[in-house]
Every structure is written in structure tokens, then in C-alpha cells.
Amino acid sequence: MHAPNVAGRRAEREIERVSWRDHHRQSVVMPPTMDTVTRFDDDGLRVVLSSSSVYPESTAAAFALASRLGYHGVEIMVGTDATSADPHALAELASYHQVPVTAIHAPTLLLTQRVWGTDPWAKLERAGEAAATLGAAVVVVHPPFRWQRNYASVFTDGIRRLEANTGLIYAVENMYPWRGPGGGEVRAYAPSWDSSLLDCDHLTLDLSHAAIARQHSVELVRDWGERLAHVHLTDGTDGPTDQHLLPGEGDQDPGAVIDELMRTGYTGQVVAEVSTRGMTRHERAAALKRTLDFIQVRVGLTERPSS
């Protein structure tokens, strides 16, 4: 007898639980076959769905949605649920849905400090191992927190060592200053929340973080040049919280950002990382489809709709 495909059955139950065809009745959406899956060269731009975009639904739901809507891959936010931290379960989900894992977001957030232990270097090494197992090329990393003194003191050297040892891209994400009720800034990251100032070869641009930091994402694309290795496509304003709005709902002009990426010949991943927390499943699917369409039209993968 064959061993049961636990992740596959979990995915089947997830699909059965979510209705895509009809908002009022459930229906089963089977994953595409190998013959129907679009393949992309390693050097080609990919439009990817972050698993955090389906929260509070599960990582399995992210694969189901990515497959259903036509995303090229999934970026895994490690720590959102148990499956996100299990490379073998992720591999089975990727195979079942025929949607590859293209990036691993290491559990270096404030809310994931105890996922994969508490040693930050062990977390990054484990993220690299997961990426290698799953065939992902990118590990997304947040800068150290101020209280992680030893880690922060050798952060950039350690990132270079990891890249040299693994052959992976460890792309450090831009963050933002924390602000108190009176508007004063709290120093939460070291050496800096601004990844522009870090001596790192590869950076991740998050448009929502740029908005809170009162930066302009288009300018960051230009300033970073070849250091820009990964993009979290979203939107935001300079409010007190990290909003991760849908494209066009904030002040970062994500369309202009994509245009600049195309002008510079960017061939990395454009990852939809938006908040759908307050939405129904039907609304979530529609919002992520609109986000996918927005990106694909701007990068020229689909034609603009006729007016």
C-alpha cells in the first residue's frame, strides 16, 4: 500500500471547503494538470502570491487560490500556520496544485520570534534549507531589531556568508520607523530600518513599508539599481499602521513602480502582498484577481481591457 498523501488530502479538503464558482454553494475546484501549468524561465519575471495575502485563511488556501487565479508561484510567510513551517508539507501542496514556491519569507517578524527557535541565524539557515528543498531562489529577511545586539553587529557580513554558502539570494526588506502617539520615532531596528543604508547586495522593496516611512517607492527602485532583487507589490499611506492596501488605494503609485521596473529590465519576482483580512472568501478571491490583473497588464503579460 502507498503511504497516504496527507498534504494532498488536506489540500483537497481545503478546496472542497472554499467555493470559487458560486458564492452561495460549495464546489470542488481541481488543480490543473502538468500539461496546463505555465512554465517560466528562471530569468523571467514572475507574478507571485504571498501566502500572507490570504490571512486569516491557511497556507493551503494560498496554494489553492494561486492555482485558481493564475499566479506564477507562492511566497511562503513562515509562521502564519504550522504548514508554512513544514517544507515537506509545502512541497506536497506545490506538487498537488502545480504552483511552485518561489520565495521563503524567514520568520524574522516581531510576531514570529519563536518560530523555528529564537536564534536569528538558525532561522535564516533553516529558511535557506527550506528554499533549497522547495526550489525557491529567494529568502526575504527583515533587518534585526535593536535589542538583537549581537545579531545586528554582524548582520551584513552574516547575510553575505549565507549567500556565499547557499547560492541563494537573501533579500533584506525595507522597514519603517515606529512612531509613538505623539509622532515621535522609536528606534526599533539596527543598524537601521532603512535598508538603503545597509551594506547588502540584495534588497526587497515593500511599497507599504515605504509609505509608512514617507518614502517614494519609484525613487527607491531608481536608487537601489541592481541591488533590487525582490518586490512586495502593495500600496499604503503614511498612517500609523502597516496597511498593505490593494494597488491604487494608497499613495505609492504601484503602476509607476512597475513601469520603472520594466524600464530597468527587472526580472525578479513581483509578489502580491496585500491585506484581505476583513474580506469574505468571495471578496478575497476577487481582490487578489484584481491585483493579479493589475500587475499583469502593467508588465505586459496580458492586454489592457478595452474601454
Where are the predicted features?
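Structural preference for beta-strand elements that scaffold enzyme active sites
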Residues: 44-48, 73-75, 100-103, 137-140, ...
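Acidic/histidine-rich catalytic cores of soluble enzymes
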Residues: 162-251
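Active-site acidic/histidine proton-transfer and metal-coordination neighborhood
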Residues: 39, 96, 113-202, 305
